[in-house]
């Protein structure tokens, strides 16, 4: 168990969980009132037994009329209590689910990139869907049973004490015995619940990977492999669920057997004249009815333990994510629009404290409006360097200055407003063309501005040919568009944002040469008047850059124009020869 999970173990988790009830306390109070009414009606039903017996022993017209009315009244009251308790608790449950999911999702949007690097999408989605439902079961469904059946037991026990406190003392011995049994199974329930939640995350993760990569799966014949992977995850989930069911199936009848033995002993003692005393036949039957009626609510109270333990285990997982530290945003400087001068001074960075440095002693100056290309072999640190600009990761060594001001002095929102990013991994949403271009903070853009951005990105032609033009739904990640069309959509989004700094991280590497050539004019339009950093794989696309920075093993090894570096006949020239010799071959 993690430190966070330990910190909020047991009652502390439930206490934090119940804090979600505060905004809904009025509705919750109505649910409690309904359960109290239900419990009182159940106790009244036991007491009504003596009136029924009396009416049978001494028949009278009044008894014949009043006893049936009493029964109808008690059941009507019980029905009212059941309705109020059930309906208002359901409203509380939906309210908690909604609030917790919103809080979880909101927190997810402000977590640092490192968190997403170490957590799979499937597990994160499973927390928002499956785990929150389990938590709600503990917070509401379990409370319904605890309140309704708990008040019922209290009401019946109170009545039994009133009728014969001596007999009832024996019944109270049940408490510690049942408590020991519940304590044992609770630990097992919680342990298995954690495994079930983890396995549900595995199931979701495998399914989402297979669905998202269905083209690769079919192309490479991975259907059987993915099926077996999913089957193993699902079988583990079933195994843990069956262990939970087995524990619950064994604990419930054992507790019921203990209760039945005590009730039998109670009846045996009550039949003794010395113990029974002056109890009438009606009072005796009413007492036995109350004692036997206690069995059902006590059984339900023990069964709900499984729900509570599942909820506590799920809550530990949910609270663990909610307690994850958010992105550091200690800067306060808000810039309207920067000029775009960047300076890297002795910059160093590693993805982990123990890991090998990804960047070492980076010193570089980029003037406003310059186009700087970053080239080098895979793993040389190109993408890492550009990812530090919008502070997706925080650097600890050296400094990055933007217009002479340390990057960490900028408020994150202000800093990221100055930067547009176009990568090889195009992200489009299952929304309209307009909403994909005018995304997020750009939502206030006018239709004319969106259209102009699409035109500048050379996307207007294919957009107008879509069924509903700018109102066409694109499907998940724009599956209805070709690779080049999807890339032009992202360029249109960047044009609409109109940021002074542009990052092109292998923006055309996923396209073929023909598509890349067609999109080049849109990229040139996007780059005009902006400080542009281009992470390039194809050297032919960056020959006109103002400055080419060659990186190797996290260090800058060469800087210069294309002509200067070719004449120097160093690392860049070697890369250039290698790439163009492969192209000729």
From Swiss-Prot:
Q: Transmembrane region positions?
A: 24-44, 65-85, 143-163, 165-185, 253-273
Catalytic activity, reaction form: ATP + H2O + lipid A-core oligosaccharideSide 1 = ADP + phosphate + lipid A-core oligosaccharideSide 2
Gene Ontology CC terms, in alphabetical order: plasma membrane
Domain ABC transmembrane type-1 per the UniProt entry, residue ranges:
29-310
Q: Which domain of life is it from?
A: Bacteria
Keyword Chloroplast listed: no
The protein's UniProt keywords, in alphabetical order, are: ATP-binding, Cell inner membrane, Cell membrane, Lipid transport, Membrane, Nucleotide-binding, Translocase, Transmembrane, Transmembrane helix, Transport
**Cellular location(s):** Cell inner membrane
Entry membrane topology: Multi-pass membrane protein
Concerning CDD domains, the annotation shows: ABC_6TM_MsbA_like
Identify the residues that bind ATP.
Answer: 376-383
All copies of the ABC transporter domain together span 342-578
Q: What is its EC number?
A: 7.5.2.6
A Pfam family found in this protein is ABC_tran
Q: Name one GO molecular function term.
A: ATP binding
Q: Belongs to which family? A: Belongs to the ABC transporter superfamily. Lipid exporter (TC 3.A.1.106) family.
Q: How does it assemble?
A: Homodimer.
Domain note = In MsbA the ATP-binding domain (NBD) and the transmembrane domain (TMD) are fused.
NCBIfam families, per the entry = MsbA_lipidA (TIGR02203)
Functionally, this protein is described as follows: Involved in lipopolysaccharide (LPS) biosynthesis. Translocates lipid A-core from the inner to the outer leaflet of the inner membrane. Transmembrane domains (TMD) form a pore in the inner membrane and the ATP-binding domain (NBD) is responsible for energy generation.
Recorded protein name is ATP-dependent lipid A-core flippase
Q: What is the protein's species of origin?
A: Hahella chejuensis (strain KCTC 2396)
């Amino acid at each position: 168990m993690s430190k966070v999970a330990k910190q909020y173990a047991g009652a502390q988790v439930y206490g934090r969980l119940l804090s979600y009830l505060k905004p809904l306390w009025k509705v919750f109070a109505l649910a409690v009132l309904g359960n109290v009414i239900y419990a009182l009606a159940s106790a009244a039903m036991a007491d009504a037994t003596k009136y029924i017996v009396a009416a049978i022993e001494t028949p009278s017209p009044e008894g014949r009329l009043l006893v049936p009315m009493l029964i109808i009244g008690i059941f009507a009251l019980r029905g009212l209590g059941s309705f109020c308790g059930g309906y208002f608790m359901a409203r509380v449950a939906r309210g908690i689910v909604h609030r917790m999911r919103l809080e979880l999702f909101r927190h997810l949007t402000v977590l640092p990139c490192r968190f997403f690097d170490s957590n799979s999408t499937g597990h994160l989605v499973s927390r928002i869907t499956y785990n929150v439902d389990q938590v709600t079961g503990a917070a509401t469904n379990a409370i319904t049973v605890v309140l309704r059946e708990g008040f019922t037991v209290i009401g019946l026990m109170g009545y039994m004490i009133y009728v014969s406190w001596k007999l009832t003392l024996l019944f109270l011995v049940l408490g510690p015995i049942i408590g020991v049994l519940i304590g044992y199974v609770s630990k097992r329930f919680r342990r298995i619940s954690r495994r079930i939640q983890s396995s549900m995350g595995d199931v979701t993760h495998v399914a989402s990977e297979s669905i998202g990569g269905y083209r690769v799966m079919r192309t490479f014949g991975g259907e059987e492999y993915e099926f077996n992977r999913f089957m193993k995850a699902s079988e583990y989930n079933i195994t843990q669920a069956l262990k939970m069911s087995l524990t619950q199936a064994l604990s419930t009848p054992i507790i019921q057997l203990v209760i039945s033995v005590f009730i039998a002993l109670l009846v045996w003692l009550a039949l003794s004249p010395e113990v029974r005393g002056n109890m009438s036949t009606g009072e005796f039957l009413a007492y036995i009815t109350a004692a036997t009626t206690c069995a059902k609510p006590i059984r339900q109270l023990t069964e709900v333990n499984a729900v509570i333990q599942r909820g506590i285990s799920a809550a530990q997982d949910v609270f663990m994510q909610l307690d994850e530290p958010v992105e550091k945003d200690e800067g306060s400087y808000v810039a309207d629009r920067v000029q775009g001068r960047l300076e890297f001074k002795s910059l160093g960075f590693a993805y982990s404290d123990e890991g090998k440095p990804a960047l070492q002693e980076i010193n570089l100056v980029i003037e406003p409006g310059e186009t700087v290309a970053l080239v080098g072999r895979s793993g040389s640190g190109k993408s890492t360097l550009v990812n530090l600009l919008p502070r997706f990761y925080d650097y600890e060594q050296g400094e990055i200055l933007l217009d002479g001001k340390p990057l960490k002095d900028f408020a994150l929102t202000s800093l990221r407003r100055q930067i547009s990013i176009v990568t090889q991994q195009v992200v489009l949403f299952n929304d309209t063309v307009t909403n994909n271009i005018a995304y997020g903070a750009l939502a206030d853009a006018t239709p004319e501005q969106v259209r102009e951005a699409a035109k500048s990105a050379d996307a207007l032609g294919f957009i107008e040919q879509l069924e509903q033009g700018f109102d066409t739904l694109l499907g998940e990640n724009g599956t209805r568009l070709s690779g080049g069309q999807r890339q032009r959509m992202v360029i249109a989004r960047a044009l609409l944002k109109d940021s002074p700094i542009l990052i092109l991280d292998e923006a055309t590497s996923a396209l073929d040469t023909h598509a890349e050539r067609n999109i080049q004019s849109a990229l040139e339009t996007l780059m005009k008047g902006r400080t542009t950093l281009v992470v390039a794989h194809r050297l032919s696309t960056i020959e006109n850059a103002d400055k080419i920075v060659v990186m190797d093993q996290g260090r800058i090894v060469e800087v210069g124009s294309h002509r200067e570096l070719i004449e120097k006949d160093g690392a860049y020239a070697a890369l250039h020869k290698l790439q163009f010799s492969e192209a000729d071959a």
